[in-house]
Structures are given as structure tokens and as C-alpha cells.
Amino acid sequence: MADNLHWVGTWTTSPAPAESGAFSNQTLRMTMRASLGGDTVRVRISNAYGHRPLDIGGACIALRDAGPAIIGGSERKLSFGGEKTATIAAGAVLFSDPVALGVAPLADLAVSLYLPGEIPNDFQVTGVTHGRPTISRRRVISPRQR
């Protein structure tokens, strides 16, 4: 991807306490409606209010179908500096590498993050009062076992 792209935010929200309590080795899927469209996307993941490092074991973005379901063929794996996994220090933010994905204005998107290890009760997710992230009981994006 070209380094001279001009990025514009299309969706944001405030951190809010997770209502699911502690969990481990789960995929967290967040859905959102993009206000603007485009043909290239990247994702900003914040650990700005975190008290410990946040490990990302895998991530993807896709066009959302209905509920937590995604539109087949639209899923794009995300990388961070060319790597499939990343650790975000407490108080830091991380941007994914850009990926090609055609997003129409007002399109619904789904971002999935595989969070390996133990996630404590004080974990905060982004969301609005009635916009709840889905926590999968399966490791949808977990690394393959060799």
C-alpha cells in the first residue's frame, strides 16, 4: 500500500466496562456502522486505559451481514507491522497495516480480535449503551496448532 494515503476516521466510540466478566482465549467481535466509505481500511486498537499489556493473537475485519455474521468473501486478515500478532503496551494504541476492502458509506463492519490468555474483569471494550460486542466461545481466529 502507498505510504502517502490520507486516513480519515469513520467510526469511534468511548471505552466502557465489559459486562461479560473475565474470560480466556476468546474472540471478541465488535460491529459498527462506517459513516464514510473507501477502498482501503486500517483499524486502531487502543489500550489507552489498560493497566497491563494487551496481547492480540489474531485480527480480521469484514463487511457485516446480520447480527455477528459476516458477508462471505469480505473477511480480511489484519497485520501489525507485517506480523499477525501484536502486544499493545498499557497506555498505548496500535494501528493495523492497511488492507484493501471496499466499504460503502453507512456499511456495517465487523472487527474480530482473538485475545489469547486470561482477560481480567476490569477489561474495557468500546461500545455504546445498546451496542454489545459478541464474545465467541470458540477461538474463531486462534492460531493453528502444528
Report each predicted region and the residues it spans.
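N-terminal secretory targeting modules
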Residues: M1-R146
